[in-house]
């Protein structure tokens, strides 16, 4: 068995090196710049509009809005800022609770922490690794009630439960129909952490557009990048106008006066970053096609092994942001991580579960059996587009 696993590990290394046609270090996900990035950056520098006012910021918002078919897209400095603003606009405040998943990147929880809110960790479902509707329904039935005003409250503490925040893990859409039904039943706001899922669709609708708010990320390791950046997607026109206002320091428009009508955030994306984003959006469909081809190759490679490649759920079309595979046991996972990284091929474990981090160790949580199993068995594979 050990010999067989070692053989698979070496075959995987060879497969990945052949795929990327290099003997150099292979990162997990690198950006590709093969279009108008340099030209648009030069244009921005020549214009002197390098901060949050400039034509590329507006153009980037339009491109993302049209691609996702959302009501309004508001560009922010990063995905965490988009989440933070979404929580603020949803009325989440100090002492409130937000239901989310423990299997996520820490930014999900950091955003609600900085609102003064606390996470409630519920298990993932074992197919797409997003927030499980059944586990969420069970937790709510056991621990929540609606008060006379229709506010969802935690029975033991009386704290208001304000929102449900699923994350579309590795780009695979969560089960949104069921989660939306729970939000309606319990008077919760659905905020989609779509940081990883630009180009992913749930039953034909882009992720981040089914909830009241959605948040995208354009970090350097995402499907497209602005260097650093995010986008707050709003379905409602009034929400969109409020999002633009509060992320622009709540400044009231005026030709020369500086007047701010509420505490706001300095979260607007700079024009330099948006210039990158506009160029990247021009190649988004090519990038997505390349990533789906890569995922198909990985699926074919692992088909005859004891490792299970994670495919998109039947109800969705995934961007396959980070390809992932489940190892047969913890020992094989650890060996795979050690061997591949020692030989210059970056394979990484999934994030440590949020309730294991010191700042969230005391958070309320349900049974996290699927999350803990995934943590012990799942690894991510190099996922840079190969033909973009």
Model regions and ranges:
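Short beta-strand->loop structural element characteristic of the AMP-binding/adenylate-forming
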Residues: 118-128, 348
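PLP-dependent aminotransferase class I/II
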Residues: 15-16, 56-62, 70-71, 145-159, ...
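Generic structural signal for small/hydrophobic residues in well-ordered secondary structure
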Residues: 41, 64, 82, 98, ...
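Helix C-cap/helix->beta junction micro-motif
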Residues: 115, 185-186, 343
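Active-site phosphate-binding strand-loop segment of PLP-dependent enzymes
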Residues: 127-226, 231-233, 238, 380
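N-terminal "arm"/small-domain region of PLP-dependent enzymes with the aminotransferase-like
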Residues: 1-50, 381-382
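Phosphate-binding glycine-rich loop
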Residues: 50-97, 103, 111-114, 121-123, ...
């Amino acid at each position: 068995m050990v010999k067989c696993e070692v053989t698979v590990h070496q075959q995987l290394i060879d497969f990945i090196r052949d795929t990327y046609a290099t003997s150099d270090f292979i990162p997990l996900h690198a950006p590709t710049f093969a279009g108008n990035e340099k030209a648009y950056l030069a244009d921005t520098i020549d214009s002197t509009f390098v901060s949050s006012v400039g034509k590329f910021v507006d153009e980037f918002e339009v491109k993302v809005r049209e691609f996702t078919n959302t009501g309004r897209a508001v560009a922010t400095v990063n995905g965490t800022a988009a989440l933070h603003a979404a929580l603020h606009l949803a009325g989440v405040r100090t002492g409130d609770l937000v239901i989310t998943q423990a299997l996520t990147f820490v930014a999900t929880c950091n955003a609600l922490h900085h609102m003064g809110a606390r996470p409630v960790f519920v298990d993932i479902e074992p197919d797409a690794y997003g927030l499980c509707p059944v586990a969420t329904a069970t937790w709510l039935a056991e621990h929540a009630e609606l008060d006379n005003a229709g506010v969802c409250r935690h029975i033991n503490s009386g704290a208001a439960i304000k929102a449900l925040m699923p994350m579309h893990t590795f780009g695979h859409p969560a089960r949104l129909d069921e989660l939306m039904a729970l939000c309606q039943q319990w008077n919760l706001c659905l905020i989609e952490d779509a940081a990883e899922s630009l180009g992913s669709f749930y039953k034909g609708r882009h992720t981040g557009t089914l909830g009241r708010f959605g948040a995208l990320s354009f970090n350097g390791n995402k499907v497209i990048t602005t260097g650093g950046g995010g986008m707050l997607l709003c379905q409602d026109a009034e929400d969109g106008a409020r999002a633009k206002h509060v992320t622009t320091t709540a400044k009231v428009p005026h030709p020369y006066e500086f007047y701010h009508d509420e505490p706001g955030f300095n979260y607007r994306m700079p024009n330099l970053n948006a210039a990158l984003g506009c160029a990247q959006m021009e190649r988004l469909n090519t990038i997505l096609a390349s990533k789906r081809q890569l995922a198909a190759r990985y699926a074919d490679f692992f088909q005859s092994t004891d490792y299970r490649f994670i495919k998109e759920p039947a109800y969705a079309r995934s961007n396959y942001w980070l390809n992932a595979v489940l190892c047969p046991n913890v020992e094989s996972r650890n060996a795979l991580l050690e061997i591949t990284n020692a030989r210059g091929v970056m394979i990484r474990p999934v994030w440590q579960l949020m309730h294991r981090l010191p700042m969230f160790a005391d958070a309320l949580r349900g049974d996290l059996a699927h999350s803990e199993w995934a943590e012990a068995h799942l690894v991510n594979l190099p996922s840079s587009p190969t033909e973009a």
